[in-house]
Amino acid sequence: MLHAYDGGVPFHLYLKEQFKEHKNWGSKDRKRYRACCYFFWRNAIGVSRNNAEDILQWLQSHYTSDTSISETPSITHPYHSVIHNISTSIDHQTLQDWFKEEPPVWLRATNGKTKAVLQQLQKLNTPILHQSNDVVAVPAQANLNPITDFGYAYIQDIGSQMAMDWRELPLQHMCNPNHAIWDCCCGAGGKAITLLQNHPKANVTCSDVRANILENLQKRFQLLQLSKPKTQVIDLQNTVGSSNQYDVVMADVPCSGSGTWRRNPENIHFFSPLEINMYANRQLNIIQNAQHSVKLGGYLVYMTCSVFRAENEAIIEQFIEKHAGFEKIEDKYCGGNQNHGDYIYRAVLQRVR
């Protein structure tokens, strides 16, 4: 499986298809094969996958079914090919430790359904790894369909939830019906959902370049019993935002995803450093088009799930250099190793003139 995989789809989906094809593999076999594969992705950095023999030899030397006593290589940093691109705010050893651990899945209960979520987890014999109010972390392989399919909770990493915690920011006062917020790269709507969980009366518009994504977004909001946002299909790569329309513009831009790679560790084996500049150019273009829509005194919130400076701090520096009317209020990395989550970069800018 490791030799044949080409990176075309997420490995967990590829693995699922392999298990379907090999119905003779029992549950213990599937669990063992999965653990072995992900041990390889997390630790075999730089190991050739040109032939199956190289992979097998490496696994025989380093892996046992008890990963607690497996000899984990520590010479090669998982991000070694892009190490000089990592933000100076992120410690390299901390990032390595973070990458080698399988992350939990984070759930957030909706509309006061925390008790129902906890009862369902108990019924499913699912251990709770972390809990804070309506946010719960469970093991990665937990079956959460009985919870998420009925809208009791939604899945969102704690890093993203922390990035949407605006309680200490001045823009929290704009999360009401009298102010307009635009989630201009909304994707499946996760950030907008959390915004409305935190501020139920917020006036939100969501846009994306993909119409089908917006249709799915509306279904998610309906399932979670949240007020549906206004939606628009907009390609901000090629379209300038309308002038002075929004008090807050939220840009969770497409990125390398390097701050989430421990969830999909295979990605690091297929990533080219040349992609960083490609993403950075796209990101700068998007926020330069979106900034036209920020009212005077309003805010631009820039977010990525990347650990690379070129996609984060450098973008903000370039943007402010070109657009002197904006000032940086703050920038930070949310989540990360300390919080058992993804690394989410968030910068808050204000249009002051």
Residue ranges and their predicted role:
Residues M1-R353:
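S-adenosylmethionine
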